[in-house]
Structure formats: C-alpha cells, structure tokens
UniProtKB/Swiss-Prot annotation:
Pfam families tied to this protein: Ribosomal_L12, Ribosomal_L12_N
Gene Ontology terms: cellular component: cytosolic large ribosomal subunit
Protein name listed in UniProt: Large ribosomal subunit protein bL12
PANTHER family membership: 39S RIBOSOMAL PROTEIN L12, LARGE RIBOSOMAL SUBUNIT PROTEIN BL12M
Family of the protein in this entry: Belongs to the bacterial ribosomal protein bL12 family.
Gene Ontology molecular functions: mRNA binding; structural constituent of ribosome
C-alpha cells in the first residue's frame, strides 16, 4: 500500500474539529509524543534569555589593528603570543565563555577600543 500524502491532506481538510482532536490524541499515544512540547520549549527559551546572567564574548572580526587586538586578547585571556594570534586569526572565536554581564561589557569595551568587532552571546 503506497502512502499518498495528497489523499491524507485532503482527508484532514474534510475532518471536523472533534475528529482532528481524536487524531492528534491517537498520534500522541501511538508514537509517545505530545503536541505541546515544542511550544513549551520555546516559552522556556524566551524566559531563559530574559534572565541571562552569563555571556560568551565572541571575537567576530579583528579589524585593521590586528596587533592591538592580539595584545588585548593576551591581556584578557592570559594566553601566549602564538595562542592569542591563532585565536584572532581564527575569528569568529570565543574569547571568554560564561562571564558575568559586567565583565563581558568590560572585555567588549577593551577589544573594541583595540579595533575588534565583538558579539556578546
């Protein structure tokens, strides 16, 4: 028996609300899923962003003053010259992860002053 999607869609269009409700319940029971789960996940994600207290500082681009950006990255991260240069050359890259909002803003200001483009995530 071949599955004909057009026929299934046509049947769904003709079904009443009660029949569609029964169909959803049957699918939930048969496959062990719920129709409400994606909506709850989206709502939880939005609430999490509103109360976000830690950020990742991402170097999006080094800009024209690459040497100054490398120096700033070394100062902020404590990395050696080679590692800091590799991080700057590999942009976009995370400079620091899971930092407080105030510290993230300070890091962003230092790096932007050095000529970098920064994104807080």
């Amino acid at each position: 028996m071949a599955l004909n999607i057009e026929n299934i869609i046509a049947e769904i269009k003709e079904a009443s609300i009660l029949e569609l409700n029964d169909l959803v319940k049957a699918i939930e029971e048969e496959f062990g899923v719920t129709a409400a789960a994606p909506v709850a996940a989206v709502a939880a994600g939005g609430a999490e962003e509103a109360t976000k207290d830690s950020f990742d500082v991402e170097l999006t681009a080094a800009g024209d003053k690459k040497v100054g950006v490398i120096k700033a990255v070394r100062e902020i991260t404590g990395l050696g010259l080679k590692e800091a240069k590799g991080l700057v050359d590999g942009a976009p890259a995370n400079i620091k992860e899971g930092v407080a909002a105030a510290e993230a803003e300070e890091i962003k200001a230092k790096l932007e002053e050095a000529g970098a483009t920064i994104t807080l995530k």
